[in-house]
C-alpha cells in the first residue's frame, strides 16, 4: 500500500491537528521546517519532590509483531516493559477483511498477536475496523450503507464469537475494543458522520452486552482534542446516547500530550463526561519524530500528562507486521537488531523506584526516577541543538547515592545513526561530581538533533552499571528445514542448544527443536544447568524451573512442526556460558 497524504507544514510537534494514517499507510510524507539550531537551554530535576512508581505508560505500539505472533523475540518486548499492542490484521490480503470475503487471515493474525501480547503481560487493543477491511483501501461498503445493518451485525457476531473462543472471559479486562480508527477522515470513514455515530452506538451496545468488563476505546481521532468541530460533536453524541467510551483516545502526529490532555479535560468536564481512566494517545510520533530525541520527549510528555501512549507505525506490507513498529531492523542474514530509539525505551524500562519532579525548558523535557543506589534521567528533545544544562537538586533526598558530598555521574548518548542499527548507548563521560548545596549541574553538548542523552547517578565509589546487553542480532525463529543434526525417527523430536552470544556474567542461546520422520504436535525440552546458571528472559516458549532443571514447552503458535523441519526458541541467561545436553519429547 502506497498512499501519500498531504500534511500541513509546520515544525515538529506543532500543536495543530494533523491528519494521520500511522501504521496503516506506507509512504506518508510529513513536511516540516528544519529544526532550530544552537539554543542553549536548561532543565531542573528536583529529587525532593517524588511521585508514584513508573508504570511505563508510553511502552505500547501499533502493530510491529509478525503475522503468526512469533516474532520479534520476547526480550525486545520485556526489556522495554511492553504494555500495549494495537492491531487487527491491517494490509493482509489487501484489499482484505470482511468486506472482501477475506476475514479469516486477518482474524488468525489478530488472534496470534493477541495471545502473544497477553503471554508477554501486555494489553491487546483490537482494531475492529481493520478486520472489517477499512485500512485505507477503497472498499465496497461501510456499516449501515443504505440503512442496512444486517451485514455489520453478522460481522460483529462472528468477531464476538471469535474473541470469546480465544478464552477471553466476559468479565475481566483482557481485550480493549477500538471500534473505528480515525473516523473523522475519509481515508478510513467515507460516509456521513451520522452513519458513523449509528455504527458506534450499535457496536458499543453489542460489545458491552457480550463482554461487560472489556474496555471500549474511542474515537481514536485523527488529530488532537479541540474545543469545537468533529471532536465536540462526537462527545455530545456519546453523552446523549449513553455510549461514552471507557477510554477516550486520539492521535498525536504531531502534538503535545500535555496540552492535548488539558483540552480534553476542558471539553469532557464541561459536558459532565467522566474520564476516570487515563486517556489513550494510541498513535504518537510522526514519521520524522521516530528517533531517540523525539521518542524520549514523547515519553516524558506522556508521563507528565498522565496519558497512556502507543507509538505509531509508519511501515507497510510485511514490515508493518514486524520490527516492533520500526524500533528494530534486520541485517543481511535476517537477524533482528535494535535501533537507537529501542535503546531509549530500554533505558525507560530500567527506571524504577519513584518518579522525580522535572521542570522542562521550551524544547527539552525529561523523565527522572530514583531508587536505592541509583537515579536515572532520560532526556528528550528533537527540535534544537546546543548546550543543555541539567540542574540536579536535592540529591540529599536520594538513597545510597551521595557519599562524602560526592556522586558519580554517568552520561550516555543514544545515537540515531540515520535510522540504522545501534549497538548500544555511547559513554560521554563517567565522572565524580562534588555537590554544592546538595546540587550539581551537568552540561550536555547536544550537537546532533536526533540523538539524546541519559544520566545515571551512582555512589562515587561504585562501578559503572553494566546491565545485561541486548541479545546480539537474533534470528527469526520460524519452522524451516535445515542441515542441523540428523532428525530422530518416528514422531520423536530432538533439541540442540547453541550459544550465540556471551558477555561477562551472561550469555544468549538458541535452542533448535527438530521433528523426526513424522510431524510433531507439541513438544517439551528439558536440560540441567551444570554450574548455577539461570534464565533471565526466554522467547517462543514457556519455561518452568526446579532447582537446576529447566523445562520449556512450546508456545501456542510453534508447537506443530512438519516432519524433518524445525523451530527454535531462545533465551538469555545469567552465569558462565553453557551448552548442556537437552532432551525433547512429544505427546
Q: Model-predicted segments: where are they?
A:
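Boundary/entry segment of secreted carbohydrate-active catalytic domains
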Residues: 39-90
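C-terminal beta-sandwich/jelly-roll accessory domains of carbohydrate-active enzymes
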Residues: 383-473, 531-535, 542-551, 558-561
Amino acid at each position: 500500500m502506497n498512499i501519500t497524504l498531504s500534511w500541513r507544514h509546520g515544525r515538529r510537534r506543532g500543536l495543530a491537528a494533523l491528519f494521520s494514517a500511522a501504521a496503516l499507510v506506507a509512504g506518508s510524507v510529513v513536511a516540516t521546517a528544519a529544526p532550530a539550531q544552537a539554543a542553549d537551554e536548561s532543565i531542573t530535576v528536583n529529587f525532593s519532590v517524588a511521585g508514584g512508581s513508573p508504570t511505563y505508560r508510553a511502552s505500547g505500539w501499533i502493530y510491529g509483531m509478525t503475522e503468526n505472533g512469533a516474532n520479534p523475540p520476547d526480550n525486545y518486548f520485556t526489556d522495554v516493559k511492553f504494555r500495549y499492542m494495537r492491531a487487527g490484521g491491517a494490509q493482509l490480503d489487501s484489499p482484505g477483511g470482511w468486506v472482501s470475503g477475506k476475514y479469516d487471515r486477518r482474524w488468525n493474525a489478530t488472534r496470534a498477536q493477541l495471545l502473544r501480547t497477553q503471554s508477554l503481560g501486555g494489553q491487546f487493543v483490537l482494531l475492529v475496523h481493520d478486520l472489517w477491511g477499512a485500512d485505507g483501501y477503497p472498499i465496497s461498503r461501510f456499516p449501515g450503507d443504505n440503512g442496512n445493518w444486517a451485514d455489520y451485525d453478522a460481522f460483529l457476531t462472528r468477531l464476538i464469537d471469535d474473541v470469546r473462543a480465544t478464552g477471553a472471559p466476559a468479565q475481566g479486562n483482557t481485550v480493549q475494543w477500538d471500534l473505528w480508527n480515525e473516523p473523522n477522515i475519509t481515508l478510513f470513514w467515507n460516509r456521513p458522520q451520522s452513519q458513523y455515530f449509528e455504527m458506534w452506538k450499535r457496536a458499543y451496545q453489542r460489545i458491552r452486552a457480550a463482554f461487560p468488563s472489556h474496555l471500549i476505546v474511542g474515537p481514536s481521532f485523527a488529530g488532537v482534542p479541540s474545543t469545537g468541530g468533529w471532536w465536540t460533536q462526537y462527545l455530545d453524541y456519546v453523552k446523549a446516547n449513553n455510549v461514552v467510551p471507557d477510554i477516550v483516545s486520539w492521535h498525536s502526529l504531531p502534538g503535545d500530550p500535555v496540552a492535548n490532555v488539558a483540552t480534553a479535560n476542558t471539553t469532557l468536564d464541561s459536558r459532565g463526561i467522566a474520564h476516570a481512566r487515563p486517556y489513550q494517545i494510541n498513535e504518537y510520533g510522526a514519521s520524522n519524530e521516530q528517533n531517540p530525541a523525539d521518542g524520549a520527549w514523547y515519553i516524558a510528555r506522556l508521563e507528565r500528562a498522565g496519558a497512556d501512549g502507543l507509538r505509531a507505525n509508519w511501515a507497510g506490507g510485511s514490515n508493518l507486521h514486524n520490527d516492533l513498529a520500526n524500533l528494530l531492523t534486520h541485517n543481511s542474514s535476517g537477524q533482528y537488531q535494535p535501533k537507537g530509539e529501542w535503546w531509549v525505551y530500554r533505558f525507560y524500562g530500567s527506571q524504577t523506584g519513584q518518579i522525580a519532579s522535572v521542570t522542562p525548558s521550551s524544547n527539552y523535557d525529561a523523565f527522572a526516577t530514583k531508587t536505592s543506589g541509583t537515579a536515572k534521567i532520560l532526556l528528550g528533545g528533537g527540535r534544537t541543538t546546543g548546550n543543555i544544562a541539567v540542574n540536579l537538586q536535592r540529591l540529599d533526598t536520594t538513597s545510597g547515592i551521595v557519599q562524602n558530598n560526592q556522586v558519580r555521574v554517568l552520561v550516555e548518548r543514544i545515537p540515531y545513526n540515520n535510522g540504522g542499527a545501534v549497538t548500544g548507548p555511547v559513554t560521554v563521560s563517567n565522572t565524580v561530581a562534588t555537590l554544592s548545596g546538595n546540587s550539581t549541574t551537568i552540561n550536555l553538548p547536544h550537537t546532533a538533533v536526533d540523538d539524546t542523552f541519559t544520566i545515571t547517578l551512582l555512589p562515587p565509589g561504585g562501578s559503572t552499571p553494566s546491565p545485561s546487553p541486548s541479545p546480539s542480532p537474533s534470528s527469526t525463529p520460524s519452522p524451516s528445514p535445515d542441515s542441523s543434526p540428523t532428525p530422530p525417527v518416528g514422531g520423536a523430536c530432538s533439541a540442540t542448544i547453541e550459544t550465540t552470544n556471551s558477555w561477562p556474567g551472561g550469555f544468549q542461546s538458541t535452542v533448535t527443536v527438530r521433528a523426526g520422520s513424522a510431524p510433531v504436535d507439541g513438544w517439551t525440552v528439558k536440560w540441567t544447568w551444570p554450574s548455577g546458571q539461570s534464565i533471565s528472559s526466554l522467547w517462543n516458549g514457556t519455561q518452568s524451573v526446579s532447582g537446576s532443571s529447566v523445562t520449556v514447552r512450546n508456545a501456542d503458535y510453534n508447537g506443530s512442526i512438519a516432519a524433518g523441519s524445525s523451530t527454535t526458541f531462545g533465551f538469555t541467561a545469567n552465569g558462565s556460558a553453557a551448552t548442556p545436553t537437552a532432551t525433547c519429547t512429544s505427546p
